[in-house]
Amino acid sequence: MTSDLRRQLILSAAKRCFARNGFAGTTTKSVAAAAAISEGLLFKHFPSKAALYAEILAEECEADPDLAHLLGQEPSTATLVELVQGMVGHFMQLRDAPDQEEAQRMRLMVTSHLDDGEFARLLYDKVGKLIGPTFAASLDRAIAAGE
């Protein structure tokens, strides 16, 4: 098995563990067991549980091609409308037809809120940094245009 494939296997196992047990209730040992590897091998790929968490966070934010498209738009009222429609549409889609991976992400978020909230805070911060500048600039342009 290649290093990249093993890394993805570990991340997949970690997502399941974090979604089921929360950040505090998940250990690197339990992630290693879920990935059917030794804890030492897990540490070759990720130096800590927090590093695993951060990698999942980065994947969640960067995996959405629609978000990448929106962030590439020129700030404007139209971009602001697209951003809001995209955010609302995302959550409506989750409600109507969540796929397995999306359901797992939602469990991870809910579990985080029920636990210490660390993952949720990190995700909100990451999303805020990704979307915030475009959102704020688009809102400013809309206000300046009187829209």
Please place each PLM-identified region on the residue numbering.
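Short alpha-helix boundary/capping elements
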Residues: 50, 61, 81, 113-118
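Conserved phosphoryl-transfer catalytic core
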Residues: 60-68
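Hydrophobic alpha-helical connector segments
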Residues: 55, 68-104
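Amphipathic alpha-helical segments used for helix-helix packing
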Residues: 97-125
